[in-house]
Amino acid sequence: MLASALLVFLCCFKGHAGSSPHFLQQPEDMVVLLGEEARLPCALGAYRGLVQWTKDGLALGGERDLPGWSRYWISGNSASGQHDLHIKPVELEDEASYECQASQAGLRSRPAQLHVMVPPEAPQVLGGPSVSLVAGVPGNLTCRSRGDSRPAPELLWFRDGIRLDGSSFHQTTLKDKATGTVENTLFLTPSSHDDGATLICRARSQALPTGRDTAVTLSLQYPPMVTLSAEPQTVQEGEKVTFLCQATAQPPVTGYRWAKGGSPVLGARGPRLEVVADATFLTEPVSCEVSNAVGSANRSTALEVLYGPILQAKPKSVSVDVGKDASFSCVWRGNPLPRITWTRMGGSQVLSSGPTLRLPSVALEDAGDYVCRAEPRRTGLGGGKAQARLTVNAPPVVTALQPAPAFLRGPARLQCVVFASPAPDSVVWSWDEGFLEAGSLGRFLVEAFPAPEVEGGQGPGLISVLHISGTQESDFTTGFNCSARNRLGEGRVQIHLGRRDLLPTVRIVAGAASAATSLLMVITGVVLCCWRHGSLSKQKNLVRIPGSSEGSSSRGPEEETGSSEDRGPIVHTDHSDLVLEEKEALETKDPTNGYYRVRGVSVSLSLGEAPGGGLFLPPPSPIGLPGTPTYYDFKPHLDLVPPCRLYRARAGYLTTPHPRAFTSYMKPTSFGPPELSSGTPPFPYATLSPPSHQRLQTHV
């Protein structure tokens, strides 16, 4: 106030002093918010005339209330030269260049530019208030501020009060130089954790430093987030395991797929999988793939499976020369890893521990089978073993087989067994007269056969046989050499042929002849008894075989005439009338009951049997060679004994069913019953003293 009064006083003083009109205060550029009041000052000194304001060169008028401009007026004391222009409320059209003019004095103030500021409105987020994005996929959010704000607003992004970087600003200007559309795009790659997050777009300018905010909520679509677990995680082979596949997803899960070692598990559906654990689960993980409309996710896990030894690499048999080094290797797997030991087949001494066995400078006795044994470090997991053979290459090993003694001018056989690795190139028999490798030479013949496999890894073997036909005296004094050769050397053995005398054989032949003679006499006696008995009886004859059930029921107590110890083969005879004119054919033996039928006569004989029921035969000769026929094999045809010849007056002898039944029998010159002296019993042999051997009892 003091300054204003001083200014007025100076103007009056100058006026009184005759000074010219001048501006005491001129308007200046100013900025005003839309809707508020604008005041442009103007003060003149030493002037008492008309004062007016122009807007962009257009006179507003000289009246204080400025008719026609309802929001405009001039204020201040005109006597003191104060002419301030007021605009209220300011609108966008008020933005112009204003001058204060003293028309009568020809004074014009400098132009004053009035700027109208328009505060920005709340920005718009495209797609808001909830924007859907895909987790893991790059996306963007666009914030837009339209037009009428002056100056152009600044668009910023915030999350939880923290400004976000990575935005791009873009502004479009209208033709009238007014601010057009302003956009700010935020680029981001959201994650599933951003689901439901709130982001703010803020528009601020000089007209509104605090700015205006618009919030947007993120709604994320994301593929399943999977967690895979196994219960129990550590399991022994053969036990059950349950896998659980849990997933969160937006949109919801549409399917599950299980795989083991990359191969689908057929029939597996849903979030659970039950299996029986085996060793493969340790190296072939189980995976669970979960899908929805956005995508899929996969998780896998491997079990800690405890299992016993499993052979991965079997030891291989080796063949080395004597004196060289040999080695075997075998690979076992297991969980936990098994202990591996090496032993020799049939032995318990541990030769080595670990997957490899080394044998330096092998000898012939090192040949054989070696065992690689795997033992689990945990009980209840089982074990395993594998074996391989070591073959030691060496000169052939030749062994003689003890030859059987031979007769002079008889056959002989010499044998040798050859084991060799590598196989022998040749096996040769040599003696004084020459040598022979294969085939025949005079009285000599060589054959070869594979030898049975033996333990020790001596390589394949063969048996070489030298046959001699018609031995000579020199053969029993000569040494026969069997030799074999391969690339490593030669092996040989000498064999001498033993001689056999004929004296034991003669004794055996004599004994056999004596036995045959005795047996023939017994058969002849039986035949004579049957003939004499047949002439006095008219009933059928039945000869009972001991142990047979036939005819046992037809024997009465009166027929037993001796003790069971002394009784020999029992002959029971039943007679029937036969005539020579009958034409019935002779029947052969019935195999179902053991009888012979000759024109109604049934005969069953068992003669020559031992007391125990067996047929006595002389033992075979003990001097026979293996595979050669037994000399003097006495086996007469005693299984069929001819039936007794039946006699009747005016009838001839009947034919027998066996052609050899009575080869030594002489046909009598006359027919009829034998003449008996008076007092002679019907059976002459009944008066004889009991024989020392089993007797033949006859029952009528």
From Swiss-Prot:
Cell attachment site (motif): residue ranges: 146-148
Tissue specificity field: Highly expressed in beta-cells of the pancreatic islets. Expression is seen in podocytes of kidney glomeruli, and in the cerebellum and hindbrain at 12.5 dpc, in the spinal cord at 10.5 dpc, and in retina and hypothalamus at 13.5 dpc.
Identification of the protein by name: Kin of IRRE-like protein 2
UniProt domain Ig-like C2-type: residue ranges: 21-115, 120-219, 224-304, 309-391, 395-497
Biased composition (Basic and acidic residues): 564-576
InterPro entries reported in the protein's UniProt record: CD80_C2-set, Cell_adhesion_signaling, Ig-like_dom, Ig-like_dom_sf, Ig-like_fold, Ig_sub, Ig_sub2
Predominant place of localization: membrane
Membership in a protein family: Belongs to the immunoglobulin superfamily.
GO cellular component, one term: cell-cell junction
Cysteine pairings via disulfide bonds: C42-C100, C143-C201, C245-C288, C330-C372, C416-C482
Reported modifications of this chain: N-glycosylated. Phosphorylated at Ser-548 or Ser-549; due to site ambiguity, the exact position of the serine phosphorylation could not be determined. Phosphorylation at residues Tyr-631 and/or Tyr-632. FYN mediates tyrosine phosphorylation in pancreatic beta-cells.
Membrane topology (UniProt): Single-pass type I membrane protein
Subcellular location: Cell membrane
Cytoplasmic side: 529-700
Record: glycosylation sites: N140, N298, N481
Variant or mutagenesis effect after changing Y653F: Does not modify the structure of cell contacts. No effect on localization at the plasma membrane. No change in shedding activity
Gene Ontology terms describing biological process: cell-cell adhesion
Extracellular side: 20-507
